Amino acid sequence: MNVLKYTKHSPSAHAWKLIGTSPKHGIYLPLFSIHTKNSCGIGEFLDLIPLISWCQKQGFSVIQLLPLNDTGEDTSPYNSISSVALNPLFLSLSSLPNIDTIPEVAKKLQDMHELCSTPSVSYTQVKEKKWAFLREYYQKCCKSSLEGNSNFSEFLESERYWLYPYGTFRAIKHHMHGEPINNWPKSLTDQENFPDLTKKFHDEVLFFSYLQFLCYQQLCEVKAYADQHHVLLKGDLPILISKDSCDVWYFRDYFSSSRSVGAPPDLYNSEGQNWHLPIYNFSQLAKDDYIWWKERLRYAQNFYSVYRLDHIIGFFRLWIWDSSGRGRFIPDNPKDYIKQGTEILSTMLGASSMLPIGEDLGIIPQDVKTTLTHLGICGTRIPRWERNWESDSAFIPLKDYNPLSVTTLSTHDSDTFAQWWLNSPKEAKQFAKFLHLPFQKTLTTETQIDILKLSHESASIFHINLFNDYLALCPDLVSKNLQRERINTPGTISKKNWSYRVRPSLEELAIHKKFNGYIEKILTGL
């Protein structure tokens, strides 16, 4: 595996130098899915600490997370209301400073912890209870001491670029009972009113800003622990953002909501997809030296060593729908989109110490793939989808993957591997034959171990599998209904999306001899 030839003199060389070019093996999961004895109904920042310990003990060196940004009332981590702010729902309540001064605190925490026993994350109950608790905590334990809190004052100053707009936006959202921006009166959307709005909603702005300070402290603690235990945290920075977001409201010159982003027609969708997300004004971003992206990356590097860029092709060209329903690529000239993508990604590489990994699934022009390799940016390889589609549709041998890539059996938007095997027996049989493995309609533990091990032996430098695909090795750790193991089904509106919960607690997993034995078997000898 000669990754150095791709990375040594690339614009990403400084990031590779920090993490090294030895093969890396990891797990991939949403934070909201895990729970410990201290969790309050949903995965929390400090729950990552026992997960890091488990990973180090087992031999994993990467934990990949879905986006951790504040999503407001939405549950999708890819529909955030801020490109920077973290989600206060992930705060570890039991570890907040001076929490013992809250009346009946033990009972309140226990009531929220019991929500971890539901089969999936109950966002309605979790949000109701956690937000009520956070407001009580702020009023009784924090508000009176803010003026003398020098660390908080420094945080307000250092993060003012995004924090004051976010705090003000959140305060107005609360005042407007969650109404979308396009339903706000003009007095709340005119930019010249922003200083007055920050003053008008001063108390609420401080509340939401202080929650971000707490999120920052807890996730920094997690990052420090991960560094000490030689485990890389891989974040996820979505390229697109909700039109009902702080960024579109405040940094409006960087976006256009009159047109929207989507995907062109293909074999699976003859009409294409309209994601109803605003497009970037790349010329204005460039004019301001990409400060919006630079600030976003600067803050994220406090928490991550590596980060996923979903839909990385979008930095080169986007499929744009106009108001009449016509779609086209912008820019559509290869010379123009290669120039644009190279400029933006080179700027992003220079803006932080983190290493980006591109989600380059689907139809990607060869010149884009070549450019990503020259930049030292990894792509993504999913063995069941990696075929010579332009010729005989044969599976591509895992040993032939570009070393500058991450191999993963499944994604948060796909069936789990066991679910795919059950639902697509014809393809699964072909895949088993390709790997020289026996085929049975129900995926056996032995075959799944073999396939997981082969995924870790691919030519890719990164091997990061969905945590669900490891848990499936033990029937007692997953639902009998495999559909419940799926994280998201794109194009559907369902409470099942983004509510997946890992059944056992992390404490239970740590002492599960059979499960840990299987993991050891998969990783031994790599």
Curated annotation (Swiss-Prot):
GO terms for molecular function: 4-alpha-glucanotransferase activity. The keyword Cytoplasm applies. Its EC number is 2.4.1.25. It is an enzyme of class 2 (transferase). SUPFAM superfamilies: (Trans)glycosidases. InterPro entries: Glyco_hydro_77, Glycoside_hydrolase_SF. GO terms for cellular component: cytoplasm. It catalyses: Transfers a segment of a (1->4)-alpha-D-glucan to a new position in an acceptor, which may be glucose or a (1->4)-alpha-D-glucan. Keywords: Carbohydrate metabolism, Cytoplasm, Glycosyltransferase, Transferase. The keyword Transferase applies. It is found in: Cytoplasm. One of its GO terms (biological process) is carbohydrate metabolic process. NCBIfam families: malQ, PRK14508.1-4. Belongs to the disproportionating enzyme family. This is 4-alpha-glucanotransferase. The gene is malQ.
